Amino acid sequence: ELVTKRLPKFTGCDGLSDMQILTPMRKGTLGVQNLNTVLQETLNPAAFDKREVHFRQIVFREGDKVMQIKNNYKLEYLKKDGTSGKGVFNGETGQVAAVNQEEKKVTVCYDDDRWVDYPYIQLDEIELAYAVTVHKSQGSEFETVFIPMSWFPPALATRNLIYTAVTRGKKNVVIVGRGDYFNAM
C-alpha cells in the first residue's frame, strides 16, 4: 500500500518510472530478489492481456521495469526516428514493451526511447528492476528513492551505503523502517 497508494499520492510520482527502491542486499526479505517478486505482483500483476515468459526463476511480463545487468556492445537497438545503433550498457533501465512467444523474444523500450529485442537465450542480460541494490544504482538518479531500513549485515550497514542511496534521489527520499537501525549506522 505504501508503494502503490500512499507514496504516489504524497510525492506525485508514478510507481514505475519515477520511483526506485534501493536496498543493500540481493537476498532476504528486503533483498532485491524478493522485493522484485512482490512488487511485480503489486505494480504489474499477471493479466489475460499481458504476455509473459518464464526464464529461470524470473517472470518477464509486458509492462515490467527491467535493467540491463552487463555491457553488451553488439546488441542492436532501433529508435522511434528510425535510427539504429549498437550497445546497451550495465545499469540502463527500461520497460518490457512486448513478449513475442512465436519469435521467442522480449522487446524492451529503454528510457531514451531505444527499442531492443532480446532473444530468450539472452534474457540473462536483464533483470527486474522495481528494486535494485544500492551498488547497482551508483551513477543513476531517480525522482523518488525509497529505502527500506531493517537489520542488514554489518558489512552492508554503513553510513557510506546510506549516503549513496540517499544521494540517488532528486526530489524525494523516503526511508521506512525502525529508527534504531538507522541510528546505529
Language model regions located:
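Conserved helicase motor core of P-loop NTPases
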Residues: 1-87, 97
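C-terminal accessory regions
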Residues: 90-185
